Amino acid sequence: PLVIQDKKLNQDGSLRYPALWMDHWFGDKVMVNGKIWPYLSVKKGKYRFKLLNGSTSRVYTLSLVPPSGTLNFTVVGDEGGLLEAPVPGVGALTIGPGERYEVIVDFAGYAAGDHVLMQNSAGAPFPNGPADLLQVMEFRVTSQNGDTDPLPATVRPIQRVDPAQARQARDFRLK
């Protein structure tokens, strides 16, 4: 998994927390799995990442920035588990605190030595604050070939509930 969090650090590298309670809190550094601005070496092929926003208050709008062209996420899962079918062509993914997504990223079209950035464009506080933490992490493409198999059309078959089979119907009125 890629656990994305914003943190503030003291001069010695220890975590700095506010002395008083705050209704929301934003760090000045983005960490992925406990590291600031990390990189991951990737083969030319597909990777499945579980993304988790582990921040206290910050919302992220994540996108991938390759050396040229565009690179999109294919979403295969969310809070409810695996989706019925992959959702390709997702250019930006907005993810709130505690929220999870499972995505496929395909690095097959890139050359060894290419760098793909994962960036955040969401403001803090969301949605109208300044986008102050842009860099999240970097993927470095190696010369090795990875998984290039096509994604299945169905990730997880979902059996639909037939409303006609309900034994009892209830109406809820909220005031």
What is each PLM-predicted segment?
Residues 165-175:
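Conserved, compact domain cores that house catalytic/ligand-binding motifs in diverse enzymes
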